[in-house]
Amino acid sequence: MTAPRLRRAAFGFSLIELLVSMVIALVVTIAISTVMVRSEGSKRATTSVNDVNQAGTYIAYVLDRTIRSAGSGYAQRWSDTFGCKIDASKSGTAVLPLPTAAATPFAHMPQTFRLAPVLIGQGKADEGTSVRGDVLTIMGGTSGSGEVPQSVASVTGTTVRLPNTLGYQPDTSGQYNHLVLLADKTAAGCLLEQVSGKPTSDTLSLGNTYFKTTGSLVSVTSFGATSMAVQLGTDAVNPPQFTMYGVGDNSTLYSYELLQMINTGSVPVADGVIEMRALYGVDNTTPLDGTPDTWVSPASGSGYSQEELTDGSPGAQTRLRRIVAVRVGFIMRTSLQERASERFSGGAAPSSMTLTLFGDLGTGLSKTRTITGDGLLYRYRTIEFTVPLRNVMLAPTS
């Protein structure tokens, strides 16, 4: 008799169970991957926006500090100094007027500059069809003492005699390398010179890097008892701020040092900037009270274009004195190009969008930029701030 064969219990998974578990695992994997991709995309977008915000804050700090000091050293005698053509040389070579046109984004700026606290060159940074906005030119001394120009008693080829030289103290390195701007209504320009050695009680000896007897426009002997001496600072330790700012290639804000104290050529300040605009705050009160009564565009024909403010006329000089504030606006763009599905909630980009600067001032003064195409896949920020011209506000009314 054959014994019955015992049946073993089945172990493992059936084919159906395996397929079901694979489907569940695949769904979970897709869900986790989707969450991670969206999380990383959000993280990249947040980081990119934070970078733009930090760059905007830094730009606002740099320009606020520079503009607030505009006019330092010479604004108190604006009727003698505003609008004079600047003549400067370094190591015997002409620096101003510029020997050749500056590089982009300052290629459309003039080669001859007139002394003014702030000038706005409307559209001067634009290059071809690329709209980049305005160029800001800011001029101010940094001496920290002797902020009021002194009357000149007499001038020779290598000396300038003043009522006193108390403001010409050694810098932190113990050197007497003060920069002096000689200005006179009757001269063809104002001449930058440099002190050489410790001055006597009333006389400055001229020499060093920024000394030249005869410049491109005027010579030392063009000045005399009717002239003014403006102390601007020193060339190394505390150089004056005669600087242009404009948006150039690669969405970068550049600066250009007119006197070439430290840098030559265009120097990047911050990236992520695609456009810069500015307006003048003008005091129209008679007598002047130091408060901006209206905002004025630097457009041609307004009386406040760069060309009209630097034509050397008494009217231009008076208008420069009326400028007591500057309002600056930037359009910032992130460096990250996002997918349309991540950038827009509906998953599809609109045909265009607009960004507006100075929108509260109305259509006559506001600036609008239209974004289309791939530009819609970036994120943008607009930054605006107003800076008072302290040295001009405190200057005499006449």
PLM features: what roles do these ranges have?
Residues 382-398:
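Structural signal for terminal/edge beta-strands and the immediately following C-terminal loop/tail
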